[in-house]
Amino acid sequence: MIYTSYFAKLKQIEELNIIPVSICGRCPDWYKGNQYKKLAPNYKFFMEWKQNQDNDFYIEHFQKEILDNRNIDIVLQDLFNFFSIDQQEFIKNSHIPYWMNNDFNIALICYEKPSDFCHRHLVADWMIKNGIPVKELIIK
């Protein structure tokens, strides 16, 4: 399963044996984990959005500059590569698509809480539109 979450829940994500993968342009200095910058916002429009806080502007630019330039199959393969070779072999030997395998657990993480505007929600929507189940990991 592919989840979305945020850095404040990193410890709990790891305790659930879910592989965290940052999808932000710049991670916290203390974060030493996996990063996938191909799903991060472009610095220029991100800084412009920080000034104007226009979510429609952000959505338009993120879609056009990031998501429209990504292939879902390549993104899934890149995420799959965060698993160890042994894990990959185990997952591949099942007879279902690997992103549906119960052992394929990744959390795409960034900074914002679930209720806040965040590009990870746009990434999740894009994946869902491409037939990949994604949900926000709710941890109390």
Question: What residues fall within each predicted segment?
Answer:
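Residues lining hydrophobic/aromatic ligand-binding pockets adjacent to catalytic sites
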Residues: M1-K140
